[in-house]
């Protein structure tokens, strides 16, 4: 029976009680040996013989990338062991979560002195913009991923964020300079002009000697 707007009436579903035994057996066999069943079994058997991907946390931990973005660290200079941070405030300005706050003042020697450097980890989204924009590689991301605790002693202030002097090594994580950074440096136009002038001087030197 055809209705308006190309709608059709579906045939009424036969009640299971009214079906014959043979019809129910046929329906059961079709459902049991359909392609959907074998595709599901294929996926289950493939996962059964594949290497396990689950870990027993917290007894085990997944390996992290060297450039993983976790809890921040404040770096020191390798030579003088002084803080790398110069208080420029670029990390505070670029922070999209507005979780970094820097308070600076003028020291006795006339240089800028950092009075307070705080990061609200409750608002931080670990985007890494602060580490990218830092001109002195003063703030980087470490590998401490577990930052939830019920004890106040677990949390700290700026002295706890600073890298300890006994473990001063060149940082290679997120925000650091790449290994081949020197090879990827592009020369400036001024260096090209200097090279051209040196080449011209080297070419003119033999001509002057021959004239003499």
Swiss-Prot record:
InterPro entries: 4Fe4S_Fe-S-bd, 4Fe4S_Fe_S_CS, NADH_quinone_OxRdtase_chainI
UniProt main location, coarse: membrane
Catalytic activity entry: a quinone + NADH + 5 H(+)(in) = a quinol + NAD(+) + 4 H(+)(out)
PROSITE patterns assigned to the protein according to its UniProt record, in alphabetical order: 4FE4S_FER_1, 4FE4S_FER_2
GO function term, MF aspect, one: NADH:ubiquinone reductase (non-electrogenic) activity
Superkingdom, natural source: Bacteria
Keywords: 4Fe-4S, Cell inner membrane, Cell membrane, Iron, Iron-sulfur, Membrane, Metal-binding, NAD, Quinone, Repeat, Translocase, Ubiquinone
GO annotation, biological process: aerobic respiration
Binding site for [4Fe-4S] cluster 2: 95, 124, 127, 130
Residue ranges constituting the 4Fe-4S ferredoxin-type domain according to the UniProt record: 76-105, 115-144
Enzyme class label: translocase
Gene Ontology cellular-component annotations: plasma membrane
Membrane topology, as annotated: Peripheral membrane protein
Location(s) in or outside the cell: Cell inner membrane
EC number: 7.1.1.-
Cofactor(s), names only, from the UniProt record: [4Fe-4S] cluster
Cofactor, how bound (note): Binds 2 [4Fe-4S] clusters per subunit.
Binding site for [4Fe-4S] cluster 1: 85, 88, 91, 134
Family that this chain belongs to: Belongs to the complex I 23 kDa subunit family.
The protein's assembly and partners: NDH-1 is composed of 14 different subunits. Subunits NuoA, H, J, K, L, M, N constitute the membrane sector of the complex.
Function in brief: NDH-1 shuttles electrons from NADH, via FMN and iron-sulfur (Fe-S) centers, to quinones in the respiratory chain. The immediate electron acceptor for the enzyme in this species is believed to be ubiquinone. Couples the redox reaction to proton translocation (for every two electrons transferred, four hydrogen ions are translocated across the cytoplasmic membrane), and thus conserves the redox energy in a proton gradient.
Protein name, entry field: NADH-quinone oxidoreductase subunit I
Organism of derivation: Helicobacter hepaticus (strain ATCC 51449 / 3B1)
